[in-house]
Regions:
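N-terminal interaction/assembly modules
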Residues: 1-77, 109-110, 135-143
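Short helix-coil-helix linker/hinge
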Residues: 76-86, 94
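Helix-turn-helix DNA-binding module
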Residues: 95-118
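DNA-recognition helix of helix-turn-helix
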Residues: 113-139
Length: 143
């Protein structure tokens, strides 16, 4: 597995792809339910009455922080339409489309079958989305 780069260190599309894959790998392993009076912030249980802690201080571990950045900060603002976001989720193994379960990275054949498109069309949509995300990240780095 390649090393996952921080946003400021991303310099090519492959770095963006690795961050997206990494984010879904981290999310796949996190618990969903928290005990009473606790909230689950990406795998770490925090008492809900603790409001004075800064949001970024609640997270532990570099992997979780990087996954949270993709899932929270990038995801809603990146210039990719909802259909391609669903394709990204499905390819990365998230419960998307008709698959209601987590898995590893799905094959292009599975992605094509799910979206009723040719395998090369699925790859092209993926590549176009990754280019758009890369340009978005470059704008973040320049700001």
């Amino acid at each position: 597995m390649r090393e996952v780069k921080d946003t400021k260190d991303i310099c090519k599309i492959e770095d963006v792809e690795e961050r997206v894959y990494h984010s879904f790998r981290v999310y796949r392993r996190l618990p969903f339910d928290a005990p009473k009076d606790y909230a689950c912030y990406l795998g770490r249980f925090i008492k809900t009455d603790v409001n004075d802690i800064q949001e970024h201080e609640r997270f532990i571990g570099r992997d979780i922080a990087l996954a949270e950045e993709v899932g929270v900060e990038w995801w809603h603002d990146m210039p990719v339409d909802i259909e391609d976001k669903t394709l990204i989720c499905f390819r990365c193994g998230a419960p998307a489309g008709t698959a209601g379960y987590w898995s590893g990275v799905r094959s292009w054949k599975s992605v094509a079958a799910e979206f009723h498109i040719h395998r090369n069309t699925a790859k092209n949509r993926w590549n176009t989305a990754m280019k758009a995300i890369f340009e978005y990240v470059c704008r973040l780095n320049c700001a």
